[in-house]
């Protein structure tokens, strides 16, 4: 968490470096991998190549090994800035702007006390408005927002707030995606920074054109004639695609 705090101070001028991690770490390998993704910094592994865990590495990169990066480095959410997440008894939250107007957010339980083995975390619609802190005029209070749980692959419109439990030393990754003209572009599911895996070329009430930057399962939220659908589209090669409602 010190790296996130340092970024709040130094990230105004430089991209951070969250240091190395072991992909084979059975306690926090996946947690550290996701923190590297949202940090926007370099990624380097310290385990021996024979010990690499591809499930923790491939979600960071495309087929050529290029990192998917946020538009700005992740920093703590306001309520987490002046806390020590090891002893606070509360969830620790960080966020970064990702592609297509989305904001990626990670909620952690880093508490070391057995009394706080389980903590409650909450994501509010107003959290998305903080994207303005990274990029001017990117979000408004009237913007509709989709909350996407990366692990469960479930999506819902975030009309007010969503509450959930963090049990043990763990994290949960979410994407807050704007719903515009009945579309919300989530991106390729297999990558941690899903919104950074696609580029929106054009968007109308009935048609969406995207440039998909890697292979995998493209997730798009579609609203049409009063119905809502989380559509999954298989992408076997990076390409431009057109989606009709």
Locations of regions flagged by a protein language model:
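Contiguous mid-protein beta-loop-alpha structural module that forms a pocket-lining wall or clamp
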Residues: 147
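Short, polar loop/linker segments at the starts of domains and inter-domain junctions
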Residues: 54, 121, 156-164
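Carbohydrate-binding surface patches
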Residues: 36-39, 44, 82-143, 173-180, ...
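Aromatic- and carboxylate-lined catalytic core of secreted/periplasmic carbohydrate-active enzymes
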Residues: 33-40, 45-46, 50-79, 169-188
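Glycan-recognition surfaces
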Residues: 1-54, 75-83
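Flexible loop/turn segments at secondary-structure boundaries
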Residues: 21, 44-45, 51-55, 77, ...
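C-terminal beta-strand-rich structural cap/linker in extracellular carbohydrate-active enzymes
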Residues: 158-197, 218-220, 229-245
